[in-house]
């Protein structure tokens, strides 16, 4: 029997505030265990939380970026459960009145555009981290992450495949990055996702029993986990077995999931309003002020790149994968006056060097304006495209200005036609066999002769000029040959 998957996501994103959500402990990745926590974030008796205003504003900004409505009245709640990484035995979160609700994003699918609804975005504190791997009989708790402000983005079960989920998570990641509320470093755990999967037979509308897989921290792993769970549930139903509502742990190294516990419902957590924090209220003018502070988001940039700059869609998407790369392109495009050329050069040459050097766009040792100067040197035919690539490599190694490298390396194009003509004649006289084949009609030998000329001129000959002079000299020989016969 064939089944239709229904997939919902709970995307957790740590906010890029300087301090934690209820205390002034710093928010930063790593550090010695239990050195970035205090009595407040570890829940010591007698301590009181103070809500971080910036965390609240970042939640609103994230909601606006994801097309949500903002509740002018919301509150914090206690979510009660026991786990060693939660020292208070409850998490301060939001239950029935989240800050953001009713949003969504449009993604591209093979069948066209599809709108994925976001049910809510709520603000909460992150838990600590348990370390299991190197210990046989016990686990260690690191509370550095305790109290880091976190938003949870909860979708409706609108996704139908692993590919759609990948597309959606990547788009959310970009929205959060460009809006400046999170660094979204999945490898550091600042962006992770829980995946809810159910399947139902084709022709039925009632959703099946769902399972949840927790804390998946890469987009590829999210896709693998979804595919695995769809196959697992399909096999169970085909064997006449029931699917149990449960929470499962995804092991990406083994490519499988294992049952952790039965899936909890909201009443299991015994939510009640947090008595130590006043409700969060907004005026409409506060929300509008934050809306106006939003930078240009990826969808708008994509539209401008493709329509105004005539950049093809594939290149535009590549340029938008990083805020730093997009800003680098913006600077190069503005300075060079030729956005399409700048986009092509960045996508082909700059990205190749980043990949070869295992660097990220943030590591580029020069700005977009310097790249534009290199492009202008090439446009004005002061250097050849080949030498432009050499200059780019040296810019990556040294950070020097392109004009300096051109002068130091002697890369300037030879514009003296007499010098080029003299060199071409030498090449013709020293390559009698190739010249003879060309005169006999073997056009491909012309490319060989062009290569010889380029080497003789150390790559500094203007290709158009060299080609014209070489053809002219060869045609003279052909005319002589015709006249002789």
Curated annotation (Swiss-Prot):
UniProt GO BP: translation
EC number: 6.3.5.-
UniProt GO molecular function: asparaginyl-tRNA synthase (glutamine-hydrolyzing) activity; ATP binding; glutaminyl-tRNA synthase (glutamine-hydrolyzing) activity
Record's catalysed reaction(s): L-glutamyl-tRNA(Gln) + L-glutamine + ATP + H2O = L-glutaminyl-tRNA(Gln) + L-glutamate + ADP + phosphate + H(+); L-aspartyl-tRNA(Asn) + L-glutamine + ATP + H2O = L-asparaginyl-tRNA(Asn) + L-glutamate + ADP + phosphate + 2 H(+)
Domain of life according to the entry: Bacteria
Stored InterPro entries: Asn/Gln-tRNA_amidoTrfase_suB/E, Asn/Gln-tRNA_Trfase_suB/E_cat, Asn/Gln_amidotransferase, Asn/Gln_tRNA_amidoTrase-B-like, GatB, GatB_C_1, GatB_Yqey_C_2, Gln-tRNA_amidoTrfase_suB_CS
Classification via Pfam families: GatB_N (PF02934), GatB_Yqey (PF02637)
SMART domains: GatB_Yqey (SM00845)
Keywords: ATP-binding, Ligase, Nucleotide-binding, Protein biosynthesis
Annotated family: Belongs to the GatB/GatE family. GatB subfamily.
Assembly and interaction partners: Heterotrimer of A, B and C subunits.
Function: Allows the formation of correctly charged Asn-tRNA(Asn) or Gln-tRNA(Gln) through the transamidation of misacylated Asp-tRNA(Asn) or Glu-tRNA(Gln) in organisms which lack either or both of asparaginyl-tRNA or glutaminyl-tRNA synthetases. The reaction takes place in the presence of glutamine and ATP through an activated phospho-Asp-tRNA(Asn) or phospho-Glu-tRNA(Gln).
Protein's recorded name: Aspartyl/glutamyl-tRNA(Asn/Gln) amidotransferase subunit B
Gene: gatB
């Amino acid at each position: 029997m064939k089944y239709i998957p229904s997939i919902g996501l709970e995307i957790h994103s740590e906010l890029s505030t300087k301090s934690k959500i209820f205390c002034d402990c710093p928010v930063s990745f790593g550090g010695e265990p239990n050195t970035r926590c205090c009595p407040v974030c570890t829940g010591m008796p007698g301590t009181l939380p103070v809500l971080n205003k910036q965390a609240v504003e970042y939640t609103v900004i994230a909601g606006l970026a994801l097309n949500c409505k903002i509740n002018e009245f919301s509150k914090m709640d206690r979510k009660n459960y026991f786990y060693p990484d939660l020292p208070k035995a409850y998490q301060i979160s939001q239950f029935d009145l989240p800050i953001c609700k009713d949003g969504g994003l449009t993604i591209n699918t093979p069948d066209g555009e599809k709108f994925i609804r976001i049910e809510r975005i709520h603000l909460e504190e992150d838990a600590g981290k348990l370390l299991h791997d190197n210990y046989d009989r016990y686990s260690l708790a690191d509370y550095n992450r305790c109290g880091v402000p976190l938003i949870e983005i909860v979708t409706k079960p609108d996704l139908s495949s692993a590919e759609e989920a990948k597309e959606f998570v990547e788009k959310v990641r970009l929205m959060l990055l460009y809006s400046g509320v999170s660094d979204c470093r999945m490898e550091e755990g600042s962006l992770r996702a829980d995946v809810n999967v159910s399947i139902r037979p084709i022709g039925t509308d009632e959703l099946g029993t769902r399972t949840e897989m927790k804390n998946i921290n890469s987009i590829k792993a999210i896709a693998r986990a979804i595919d695995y769970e769809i196959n697992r549930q399909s096999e169970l139903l085909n064997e006449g077995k029931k699917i149990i509502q449960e929470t499962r742990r995804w092991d990406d190294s083994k490519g499988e999931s294992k049952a952790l516990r039965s899936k909890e419902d909201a009443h299991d957590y015994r939510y009640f309003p947090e008595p130590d924090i006043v409700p969060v209220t907004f005026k409409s003018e506060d929300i509008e002020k934050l809306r106006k502070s939003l930078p240009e988001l990826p969808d708008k940039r994509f539209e401008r790149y493709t329509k105004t700059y005539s950049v093809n869609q594939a290149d535009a998407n590549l340029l938008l994968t990083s805020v730093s790369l997009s800003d680098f392109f913006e600077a190069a495009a503005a300075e060079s006056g030729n956005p399409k050329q700048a986009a092509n050069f960045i996508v082909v040459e700059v990205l190749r060097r980043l990949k070869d050097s295992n660097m990220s766009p943030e590591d580029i040792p020069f700005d977009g304006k310097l790249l534009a100067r290199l492009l202008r040197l090439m446009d004005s035919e002061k250097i050849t495209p080949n030498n432009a690539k050499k200059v780019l490599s040296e810019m990556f190694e040294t950070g020097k200005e392109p004009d300096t490298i051109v002068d130091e390396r002697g890369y300037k194009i030879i514009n003296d036609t007499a010098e080029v003509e003299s060199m071409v004649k030498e090449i013709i006289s020293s390559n009698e066999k190739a010249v003879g084949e060309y005169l006999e009609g073997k056009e491909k030998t012309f490319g060989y002769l062009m290569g010889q000329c380029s080497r003789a001129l150390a790559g500094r000959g203007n290709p158009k000029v060299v080609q014209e002079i070489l053809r002219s000299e060869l045609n003279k020989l052909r005319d002589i040959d015709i006249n002789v016969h």
